[in-house]
Amino acid sequence: MKIMLFVCGEGLGHTSRCISLAQQMKASGHEVLMGAYGYSKDLIETKGLRTAEMVPEIQLVGDSGSLDIKSSVIATIKSGQFLRIGKVHRMLKDFDPDIVVSDSYYTGIFSAWMRKKPVYLMVNQSNMEEFFMGKSFFMRSLGKITKRFYTMVFRKVDGIIVPDFPMPDTICKYNLDLEKRVLDSVFYSGPLVGKKYREVREAELKRPHVLSTIGGFGYREPLFHKVIETARLDRNINYTLLSGPSIDSDKFTSLPENVTIMKFIEDQFPYLKSSDLVIAPGGHSMMMEALSFGVPILSFPDMGHSEQENNATSLEEEGCGKRLDYSISPKKLLDHIHQLIENDAYKEKAQYLRSLSHALNGPEAITEMIESKYLNQGSQKKS
């Protein structure tokens, strides 16, 4: 079977989960072509996966820890990228897949419909109009148009894949607003994680250990420094901080001995397995990876980013982490770190979700579901 897998490149969470899915599809004997762009495309290619270059659908703009929706819309229109969708259609025509899977990349969905191909939408958010609430009349109107758009998409696709734990443990549940008429087409696959817990060898790290994926660039830089100040308050807790490729880690000349800064980790799963706690933004895929490895999370969602804020709220309600904000003091942050490391209830809930992730096996579950749908469609055509 030939499978086209489109990837939304806004945030590497989409990329990491699509890599996991593509690897499983290849292992199951299918021919897979991934459509991606930017750094997302580069990362996919390092995994040895066949990739075609797509065009971005949206450009995100933010400042001081918040997402600026109006500026993002204006930047997207000015870029003119949406005028190049013909490139996507031509690529789909040349590859001629049997089935299309699109991770929040809607241009790929419309191209699949034009080619009369079965198409499945992978999504962890279906209430995008929240981004436009409380804004100007123009922005609220744009939000209503957006809702009508994706409601139509949800009705017409062949299936909707939610790469999360099934209800009631779904972390992205507050980001889902699905009509009753489409619920039968929704498939909760479980997390899409690149490696299985039992296959990963722990990194040699001093415990207790905190892994922070808060980058040190742009509006997250103040929080990055705040984590370092927190580490100074208790030298018995060890930290690995990911700064991102744009930060020169050599400039940090007076780090406490319990802090290590790294630009990038090629394989972060050994670090996850050796950590007692993760400090992260509110991105869905990072949460799925940490919880699939049984690690509680302190989440700092970007302000004004309703999807991340909802994820963090659900995380706290589920008892596997806490939602915090950028204004927190180092002393208060240390209190939360102690609580999540020392309170068995958080660890037990995270360990339960690790077991559930293993049982669900998201990449394999999606592959088997698509195979079954494809075979059923073939049988129906013959009859």
Provide a role label for each language-model segment.
Residues 359-383:
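C-terminal alpha-helical cap of glycosyltransferases
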Residues 7-19, 218-222:
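A short, glycine/small-residue-rich beta-strand->loop->alpha-helix junction that serves as a flexible
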Residues 99-103, 268-310:
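A donor-sugar binding/catalytic signature common to diverse glycosyltransferases
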Residues 9, 27-28, 32-80:
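Conserved nucleotide-sugar phosphate-binding/catalytic loop shared by glycosyltransferases and other
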Residues 322, 327, 331-353, 360, ...:
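Conserved donor-nucleotide binding/catalytic region of nucleotide-linked donor-dependent transferases
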Residues 22, 191-277, 309:
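Donor-nucleotide binding loops and adjacent catalytic segments primarily
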Residues 139-219, 242-247:
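A nucleotide-sugar donor-handling region in carbohydrate enzymes
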Residues 67-107:
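Conserved nucleotide-sugar donor-binding subdomain of glycosyltransferases
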